[in-house]
Amino acid sequence: MELNKYIDHTLLKPTASEKDIIKICNEAKEYHFASVCVNPCNVSLVRKELKGSDVKVCSVISFPFGASSTEVKVEEAKKAIEAGAEEIDMVINVGKLLEGDLEYTQNEVSAITKACHEKNVLLKVIVETCYLEEKNIADICAIIEKAGADFIKTSTGYGSRGASVEDIKLFKKYLKKDTKIKASGGVRTREDAETYIGLGCSRIGASSGIAIVTGK
């Protein structure tokens, strides 16, 4: 199994320096990871560092709390795309989903999907499963499929826990179309990654991508 092609090599710490960003770009090129995932302020640097490689540029949006308005999220996504993002990982407004405001959540996910797809940019929707009950997962799966987003993603890594096997099983239970799954948060070993891929995940978000692919 070519684990490297599943890895979004991730650095989202607020303390990340330019030197740190260049380092993960070099690592991603060496190991041919799927993407480098960073905060929006670092997208242009990542684009420059990855130029000519097979590694995609990925930016998070409204990270880590998803608490920006829909309008701000759309604008942030557009700016990240202008700066060179080829993939967007957007955090939903979890509070709106939990209180049952499905119209708000649908409008938000649909608006970001439209902004991304107009520029042929892939969208991953982060739902922060640590806060969700099964009903919430069923609702957000239906919303994401209706919007036409490309991926559902478990976690930011900043919640009370990261991905779990049960999360992925519930996604598989409620996703009826071709929406892909990204496991993120707490995926640190080769065994972890192989477990999630075996359950049907198409991407793994991790800051420990090298340890995952080398087993060291």
UniProtKB/Swiss-Prot annotation:
Chief site of localization: cytoplasm
Residues forming coiled coils: none
Gene3D superfamilies: Aldolase class I
Keywords, comma-separated and alphabetical: Cytoplasm, Lyase, Schiff base
Any one GO BP annotation for this protein: 2-deoxyribose 1-phosphate catabolic process
GO molecular function, one term: deoxyribose-phosphate aldolase activity
Catalytic activity of the protein: 2-deoxy-D-ribose 5-phosphate = D-glyceraldehyde 3-phosphate + acetaldehyde
Domain of life: Bacteria
InterPro entries, A to Z: Aldolase_TIM (IPR013785), DeoC (IPR011343), DeoC/FbaB/LacD_aldolase (IPR002915), DeoC_typeI (IPR028581)
Primary enzyme class: lyase
EC number: 4.1.2.4
SUPFAM superfamilies tied to this protein: Aldolase
Annotated GO CC locations: cytoplasm
UniProt similarity note: Belongs to the DeoC/FbaB aldolase family. DeoC type 1 subfamily.
NCBIfam families, per the entry: deoC
PANTHER family listed in its UniProt record: DEOXYRIBOSE-PHOSPHATE ALDOLASE
HAMAP family: DeoC_type1
Protein name: Deoxyribose-phosphate aldolase
